[in-house]
Amino acid sequence: MHVLVADRLTCSRCGPEFGLILRADQTHDRRVTEGVLGCPNCRDQYPITDGFGDLRAPPRSELPKGLAGDPVIRTQDESEYLLPLLGITRGPATVLLIGGPTVLGPGLAALLDDIHVVGVDADLARWPTDPSWSRIVSHPGIPFFSRSLRGVVIDGRLDRHWFEEAARVIAPMSRVVVVNAVTTTSEWLQAAGLSIMANESGRVVATSS
């Protein structure tokens, strides 16, 4: 986990108004491989193990099955289509991938300088440590400050709450991209305050004002 990503994380128990304090036990090139993220409000601690951050609010049980699956190697070309959908041409930028799209994380991170890619999915705990991006799991929402991210790519198979959270965390004039979109996707995004830019071939692009 990159230290600049850790600075943007918030407490899943207390809510997005409460930032976390990083205790880095083991780092390399500004990446935390072992450590703890602590909340000064509720005193809860979120572990970072092998670079993977568990940002689930307590009580924490065994990790559930995610949507990313086993580790795979994807090329930059397979991730390239995301950049025009996100409307990002240069950094600095922090982009969040949730669910199935997290498999494109390393490829996306390699496309631009000064971009921080964060994947959110329980299956990423089994993925090897990769300095090009950050891996976390979270519950019940997205553990980032409101209006702080340049873009979110989200799996359309997820519950409505995740779409509301995606709308909350993107910065003004930024976009949410949905892959594996379903019939209710556009309705959910609009109800969350976003405007639909495109809806085609199982992908929906929405923007904040």
Model segments located where?
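A short glycine-rich, Lys/Arg-flanked "PGG" loop and its adjoining helix->strand segment in the class I
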Residues: R160-V177, A181-V182, S186
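A generic alpha-to-beta junction signature in SAM-dependent methyltransferases
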Residues: T89, L112, R168-P172
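Short, polar loop motifs at secondary-structure junctions
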Residues: G100-L104, V118-W127, A181-T184
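Core SAM-dependent methyltransferase catalytic element
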Residues: E187-S209
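A short acidic, Gly/Pro-enriched loop at the edge of an enzyme's catalytic core
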Residues: P92, D130-G156, R160-E164
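Glycine-centered, small-residue-biased loops immediately flanking beta-strands
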Residues: A93, I115, S174
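N-terminal auxiliary segments of SAM/dcSAM-dependent transferases
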Residues: M1-K65
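Conserved alpha-helix/loop element of class I SAM-dependent methyltransferases that forms part
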Residues: I21, R56, G66-T94, P101-G107, ...
